[in-house]
UniProtKB/Swiss-Prot annotation:
It comes from the Bacteria. It comes from Clostridium botulinum (strain Loch Maree / Type A3). The keyword ATP-binding applies. The keyword Ion transport does not apply. Pfam families: SelO (PF02696). This is Protein nucleotidyltransferase YdiU. ATP binds at G94, G96, R97, K117, D129, G130, R180, R187, D266. InterPro entries: SelO. Mg(2+) binds at N257, D266. Signal peptide: none annotated. Nucleotidyltransferase involved in the post-translational modification of proteins. It can catalyze the addition of adenosine monophosphate (AMP) or uridine monophosphate (UMP) to a protein, resulting in modifications known as AMPylation and UMPylation.
Length: 491
């Protein structure tokens, strides 16, 4: 299909450095033309931070670009190739319904991938139609923006455009295209792909590109590829700890969904935990709980081991020595993760300094929450506000004992109680994207064309650490249900 190149002053300043890699890494592909694009959502704060032109983006020409009907003159649309371990099984993948337009360079020199998701078939579609449904695209928009507001590294959503098409899933659904913004779309699965089907020279090209893109200081190191591995391990240790601290369950931690940049990607079957339970699973296809909340750190370590395996030819010419180097690096993950998690949990309890018994204090609270079915977010919200009469734990012997120990712990630090409360307020969100509130917003938007519910939800989620009466509606738990909440891989 011939590309419809245009010059439209959207503010996009595109380069195409990924296209300079060997062609094994991508296939050039034009977006499919869609019949009737309409703008559903536009992310004005993100537009401002990227210094794009909102007025042009919401014009007919701008919407055509967001829909893939027109292509910016500097763009080189391409589908990226990658592989991945899905639920532990290795398979060939690739962008089956997404196209990278290029990399937007901000006036400050920052580089961001601009990707259209749901833009049509590619050579990696594996029999799929390359399309996306409106509901899952709006869901990714909501959750990714909530994650960003929570301070968790994430891909962002610039816009959602409806296509005017009906796509066939279990039923007919309205089609949509999401414009995703990311530090990059390089994945552990990208390295697995070239490790399996490429040459060592092509592997080195990807590693060098990744260093240049994300870890430039690595060039000066004695072993740049070891530095690359170590930095990715650090970033993932920080990321997974942040997930755990807010009760986020990704749901599909396949290696193709682990970014080298350390951003959260793919919001298909994700959800936030209500009642605290380490075995929490939302994904309808995760029947054995591989990606349960409590197992996410272990899965991250497993994924990183797969990444390390791909780098073995670059780490040392001696295979045995390369394995030792990789194993030593991977062994650091558990300690790095635990340090990040403990630091975050101390902050959630208003604790500034370290004591050896802190971990026991934290684990005891979590155990009590699990025993009595206490809501994860609201328990910390209640401890922060001081209204402990609002928690189901009040009056439980274990909690009353724990609460006394916690108060004693706070007295053993120099910082004031006011300082502790301020630390807790900045560490414990008052509002998260509760599953029932997200579904409420999606139903209004998709079925009724009413985006006001979603707009109000997004406004609340943009201020997660604001403790106000306006947030109360979004902090309420769902009504008891006989059916556990389930998510699906729609995105």
């Amino acid at each position: 299909m011939k590309e419809r190149k245009v010059i439209i002053k959207t503010g996009l300043n595109l380069e195409n450095s990924y296209a300079s890699l060997p062609e094994i890494f991508f296939t050039r592909q034009s977006p499919s033309r869609i019949p009737s694009p309409k703008l559903a959502v536009l992310n004005y704060p993100l537009i401002t931070s990227l210094e794009l032109n909102a007025q042009v983006l919401q014009s007919a020409d701008g919407v055509d670009i967001l829909a893939g009907n027109k292509t910016p003159e500097e763009a080189i649309p391409l589908a990226q190739a990658y592989a991945g371990h899905q639920f532990g099984h290795f398979t060939m993948l690739g962008d089956g319904r997404a196209l990278l337009l290029g990399e937007h360079i901000t006036p400050l020199g920052d580089r961001f991938d601009i990707q259209l998701k749901g833009s049509g078939k590619t050579p990696y579609s594996r029999g799929g139609d390359g399309k996306a449904a409106l509901g899952p695209m709006l869901r990714e928009y909501i959750i990714s923006e909530a994650m960003n507001a929570l301070g968790i590294p994430t891909t962002r959503s610039l816009a959602v455009v409806t296509t005017g098409e009906s796509i066939i899933r279990e039923t007919k659904l309205p089609g949509a295209i999401l414009t995703r913004v990311a530090a990059s779309h390089i994945r552990v699965g990208t390295f697995e792909y070239v490790s399996r089907w490429g040459t060592v020279e092509e592997l080195r090209a990807l590693a060098d590109y990744t260093l240049q893109r994300h870890f430039k200081e690595g060039y000066d190191k004695e072993n740049p590829y070891l530095f690359l591995l170590q930095e990715v391990i650090k970033k993932q240790a920080e990321l997974i700890a942040k997930w755990q601290l807010v009760g986020f369950v990704h749901g599909v931690m396949n290696t193709d969904n682990m970014t080298i940049s350390g951003e959260t990607i793919d919001y298909g079957p994700c959800a936030f935990m209500d009642v605290y339970d380490p075995e929490t699973v939302f994904s309808s296809i995760d029947i054995y709980g591989r990606y349960a909340y409590g197992n996410q750190p272990n899965i991250a370590a497993w994924n990183l081991a797969r990444f390390a395996e791909t780098l073995l030819p670059l780490l040392n010419i001696d295979p045995n020595e390369a394995i030792k180097i990789a194993e030593n690096a991977i062994s650091d993950f558990t300690k790095l993760y635990k340090n990040n998690w403990l630091s975050g949990m101390r902050a959630k309890l208003g604790v500034f300094n370290q004591e050896l018994e802190d971990e026991y204090l934290i684990e005891d609270l979590l155990s009590i929450m699990n025993k009595y079915g206490s809501d994860y977010t609201n328990t910390f919200r209640t401890l922060t506000s001081g209204n402990i009469e609002d928690t189901v734990l009040l009056g439980k012997m274990e909690f009353d004992k724990w609460y006394k120990l916690w108060q004693e712990r706070l007295t053993r630090q120099e910082e004031s109680r006011l300082s502790s409360k301020q630390l807790m307020k900045s560490s414990n969100p008052s509002v998260i994207p509760r599953n029932h509130r997200v579904e409420e917003a999606l139903e209004a938007a998709v079925k009724e064309g009413d985006y006001s519910v979603m707009e109000k939800l997004l406004d609340a989620l943009s201020k997660p650490y604001a403790y106000s009466k306006e947030q109360d509606y979004y902090s309420k738990l769902p009504e008891p249900s006989t059916c556990p909440y389930q998510t699906y891989c729609g995105t």
